[in-house]
Curated annotation (Swiss-Prot):
The gene is proQ. The keyword Metal-binding does not apply. Residues 147-156 have a biased composition (Basic and acidic residues). Residues 109-118 have a biased composition (Low complexity). RNA chaperone with significant RNA binding, RNA strand exchange and RNA duplexing activities. May regulate ProP activity through an RNA-based, post-transcriptional mechanism. One of its GO terms (molecular function) is RNA strand annealing activity. Residues 137-146 have a biased composition (Basic residues). It comes from the Bacteria. This is RNA chaperone ProQ. HAMAP family: ProQ (MF_00749). Belongs to the ProQ family. The keyword RNA-binding applies.
Length: 225
């Protein structure tokens, strides 16, 4: 028992629980609603294993039940399950409403953070533009070129070839298992790539939400970073 490895993060604890109780916990995809009072069941079943403490179990449960994929699973008609996957009653309406509220608040926080990041980028770009303008103003004027003598042949300026616009390079998503709920990526649509956020990973593909608010299931070959 003394040589048991120690789980250092809540994500590692969740992965351990998903392996130990696969009918109850899941490491990816939509999660099933948990039985009320399942914390005490966990303490009795895994207490002492992997050097897990009650504090670690409580923190892992909090992270698991606040994730987007868990909140998506708390919906009308869903059944709570115990550690062995046995049904433990249908969800109450107040629990469904609370989960829906938590999900909307989480989405709003992501949108706020994204808007703040975009604002910082715009401010940095504007500041860089002002610095460039100041450098141009400080440059000394060029000396005037002497006029050419009359009759001298004037050289025709060479046409400047227009530079082709640089294509934005994207990295294709080769393995959906590396994606996480809430992660930002892009959805390919022809020659364009639209910003999107991962809502859940399903067996049919990845459900994403576009910046327009529309959600859809997209196959991995149409996703890029």
């Amino acid at each position: 028992m003394e040589n048991q490895p120690k789980l250092n993060s809540s994500k590692e604890v969740i992965a351990f629980l998903a392996e130990r109780f696969p009918q109850c916990f899941s490491a990816e995809g939509e999660a099933r609603p948990l039985k009320i009072g399942i914390f005490q069941d966990l303490v009795e079943r895994v207490g002492g294993e992997m050097n897990l403490s009650k504090t670690q179990l409580r923190a892992a449960l909090r992270l698991y039940t606040s994730s987007w994929r868990y909140l998506y699973g708390v919906k009308a008609g869903a059944i709570r399950v115990d550690l062995d996957g046995n049904p433990c009653g249908e969800l109450e309406e107040q629990h469904i409403a609370h989960a829906r509220q938590q999900l909307e608040e989480a989405k709003a926080r992501v949108q706020t953070q994204r808007a703040a990041q975009q604002a910082k980028k715009r401010e940095a770009a504007a500041a860089a533009g002002q610095q460039d303008e100041g450098v141009r103003r400080e440059r000394k004027p060029r000396p005037q070129q002497p006029r050419r003598k009359e009759g001298a042949e004037q050289r025709k300026p060479r046409p400047v070839a227009a530079k082709a616009p640089r294509e934005e390079r994207h990295t294709p998503v080769s393995d959906v298992s590396v994606l996480t709920v809430g992660q930002a990526l892009k959805v390919k649509a022809g020659n364009n790539a639209m910003d999107a956020t991962v809502l859940e990973i399903t067996k049919d593909g990845v459900r994403v939400q576009l910046t327009s608010g529309m959600s859809m299931i997209v196959r991995a070959e149409h996703l890029v970073f």
